[in-house]
Structures are given as C-alpha cells and as structure tokens.
Amino acid sequence: MSRVAKAPVAIPAGVEVKLNGQEITVKGAKGELTRVLNDAVVIAQEENNLTFGPKEGVANAWAQAGTARALVNNMVVGVTEGFTKKLTLKGVGYRAAIKGNAVGLTLGFSHPVEHELPAGIKAECPSQTEIVITGCDKQLVGQVAADIRSYRQPEPYKGKGVRYADENVRTKEAKKK
C-alpha cells in the first residue's frame, strides 16, 4: 500500500488548481501545466490542500494514487520554483552556444549539432562547456537534458562527452601491452 498517497499536497499562495473530472490544471508564476490522471484515483480539493485516494474495488489503486500525488506535487513545485538540469561538456573542442530557440553543439563530429528546444523550456550557457536547462515541467526538462546528452554520451576511457553536472563517470584502465 502506498504511503505517498496519504500525504496531502499543499497548494501555496499564487497557485491556482482546477479540477475537471480526472483532468487537473495547475497555474502559477512560472507557467501552466495540465495532466489527466488515472481513473483509479479519487481527487478532492479542500481549501489549500489536495488529497488523493484509491477508488473502491480497483486493483493497485493505492499505487496509482501515490503516482498521481507525486505527479501533481511536481506540477505544483514546477509552477512555483521550476526545475533545472545542468549539463557539462568535457573534451577538446567540445562547445555549446545558444542560437535563438536552439542549442548549438560542437561535439567532434564533422558537422555542428543543433537541438531545438520545445515550448516551455529555456536553456542558457554560463560558459562554453556548460548548459543549464530550466522549465516548469519536470519530465520535459529531464527529457531535453537526456536528448542533449545522447548526442555524445561520456565514454569510459577518458570521460569525454556530455554529462550531467552531478554525474560520476567511471573510467576504465587502458589496455596494457
């Protein structure tokens, strides 16, 4: 049984929540997010709290309620504070630059790589080897960061490539003669 679903989600001041059946819309200073939740979940709004519970007679409804609570909590945090992912480029000649609504990457290929940013996602480059991705949708921020990382994942011998700032890449020892 999920214990996550038992904790209510607090709605801070400045955040507006609309319930329309199983569709929930959260609006705040950083943006607006909408999500359709599973039918096995019962949502109730009481003043400044959202409570989640299982629908009677549905298998794994507690698990679905816990998932729904975590998703809605991430929506509330996203529209108030936002989410950030930091990427670091390591390698000779590896560079990043913002070009309009895209991130331009030089990653040792014979051509530069341009990654278009979806709506609601912002990127900035504090230096040529750092990319900071921000947005209100946690899933989308993580997906954009993973897409950029996938162009050149860190290799295990020298650690060259695009990595998350907090990622620890295990390096292997080179072959001995």
Curated annotation (Swiss-Prot):
Gene Ontology terms describing biological process: cytoplasmic translation
SUPFAM superfamilies: Ribosomal protein L6 (SSF56053)
Primary role: This protein binds to the 23S rRNA, and is important in its secondary structure. It is located near the subunit interface in the base of the L7/L12 stalk, and near the tRNA binding site of the peptidyltransferase center.
GO CC annotation, single: cytosolic large ribosomal subunit
NCBIfam families xref list: L6_bact
Protein name as catalogued: Large ribosomal subunit protein uL6
Entry-linked InterPro entries: Ribosomal_uL6-like, Ribosomal_uL6-like_a/b-dom_sf, Ribosomal_uL6_a/b-dom, Ribosomal_uL6_bac-type, Ribosomal_uL6_CS
PROSITE patterns per the UniProt record, alphabetical: RIBOSOMAL_L6_1
Alphabetic keyword roster: Ribonucleoprotein, Ribosomal protein, RNA-binding, rRNA-binding
Quaternary structure (record): Part of the 50S ribosomal subunit.
Pfam families in the record: Ribosomal_L6
Membrane spanning residue stretches: none
Family label: Belongs to the universal ribosomal protein uL6 family.
Gene Ontology MF: a single term: structural constituent of ribosome
